[in-house]
């Protein structure tokens, strides 16, 4: 049957990408349908019970700046919060939280069920329908056809998923859930370029069988950090600690004894795994000289005894898993509640996507999350929001939301995917960005909220909060510039106490704050330095960073401006680069294969040289008339 209601946007999949995509589209006013094989697992944390971290936390803040759900759900479910790299530069400081799985899923479910313009339906999707070269809808397992003008696919690890434990394997999307075999086959029929990747998860441990007296405690931070600009510490549930143990030489010998039954080393697994989250057997094989690896025991929630041993993801046989777990200090009597496993799944080459995350071959079809070759909740959620928003923009015939590399880590992520592709699961690091100083956690709202508000992603309440913060920052910076001190105005002892030396000349608070040995709090102890208004910690942090890093930021802005013409210069559709004189055969082949949308994208394709970019610029100035 054909369902009687036609939707603007259909989202397939209810993981982190799918829920953000559906919420984004509905917030923008589009009639949206979210389809999942099981609505009880919407927003489920399939692997580790944590959100954020270096690079990933930056993505979460960017999501939040665009009205996304992940940061707020984390504030409602986080049972431990830590500020990473707090003593380092502002660019690499990041927030990480342990989340209660049940509370996190409940927070996401509550947002979904209370979001206007959003319908939920429980049914697996087995087919997509086309009208020529445009998407027109989907068909579910029981034959219901849902019509829509745009479809966002967020299938995670479910497309032709295969689970491995030792030499045993079976079809599955994750433990306890079926694979999306029919949909995977249908997408392959559409000639979309695809491959296989792999990820894994560790065995889960019953906390009642852990001897915590032998472990090192790792508490959260005090005061407790907050993830969302819409959140606060009062939202947080009870806070708990993580615990640290280590592998040892006995552990490593046990792991090596299972190599002959490991699907990784016997060729059973063909997919490539994540480089920066390797299995324990991969770590022992690659780093044979190391006698020990740190393992974090992370609580899964407040109402369960289950612990997640971060660092021993494995697909070794279950008997080896038991032995390796029990070889570690504090885990000698540990009971495993669930075995670790690896999962192989289909992904589709993201070089077949536009910067909007729409496929180049099927109009109105968008991909987000692990289907694009990424790994991680945060990477998936960020793509989901962007794909959901751009599906609405596509339906309305409006320009997509495109984020530049110097504007957002989400811009870096998408640009890396669509220009370079992936040969292993992609995860975000701050080192992937050229302009890290611009892309800090603390200024995500300053970078993105206005763009989100313009297209309807950001609520009026969040927009009002943002403007209040932005105006407070501007007022305080101006006040610092107009508050002056002379050597005569301050007692000599006061000068030495605050500045570490005597003032040699008149200076304002703005210039004094730029000194590396001074911070805002110390300056405010000067007589007459305190502002008349009460400033939030977020405003003070923003003021201090803007003032202290102003010189570096200005230099980066100059560099960005010098490249802006290259970055945004559009390449005409349908160009045959083989007819562009001066380009080598290799460059012609790669440009024709990748079909970049801008000169900036072309410049980041492997093998495209600066000389080739210069030739493209020359031809663009001439109009490309002869090259078409």
Swiss-Prot record:
Family: Belongs to the MnmG family.
A Pfam family that the UniProt record links to this protein: GIDA
Localization in the cell: Cytoplasm
HAMAP family given in the database record: MnmG_GidA
Protein role: NAD-binding protein involved in the addition of a carboxymethylaminomethyl (cmnm) group at the wobble position (U34) of certain tRNAs, forming tRNA-cmnm(5)s(2)U34.
Binding, FAD: 13-18
Record keywords, A-Z: Cytoplasm, FAD, Flavoprotein, NAD, tRNA processing
Necessary cofactors: FAD
Chief localization: cytoplasm
Subunit annotation: Homodimer. Heterotetramer of two MnmE and two MnmG subunits.
InterPro entries referenced in this protein's UniProt entry, alphabetically: FAD/NAD-bd_sf (IPR036188), GIDA_C_N (IPR049312), MnmG (IPR004416), MnmG-rel (IPR002218), MnmG-rel_CS (IPR020595), MnmG_C (IPR026904), MnmG_C_subdom (IPR047001), MnmG_C_subdom_sf (IPR044920)
Chain residues that bind NAD(+): 273-287
Entry's Gene Ontology cellular component terms: cytosol
Species assigned in the record: Neisseria meningitidis serogroup B (strain ATCC BAA-335 / MC58)
Domain of life where this protein originates: Bacteria
GO MF terms, alphabetically ordered: flavin adenine dinucleotide binding
GO biological process, one term: tRNA methylation
Protein name: tRNA uridine 5-carboxymethylaminomethyl modification enzyme MnmG
SUPFAM superfamilies per the UniProt record, alphabetical: FAD/NAD(P)-binding domain (SSF51905)
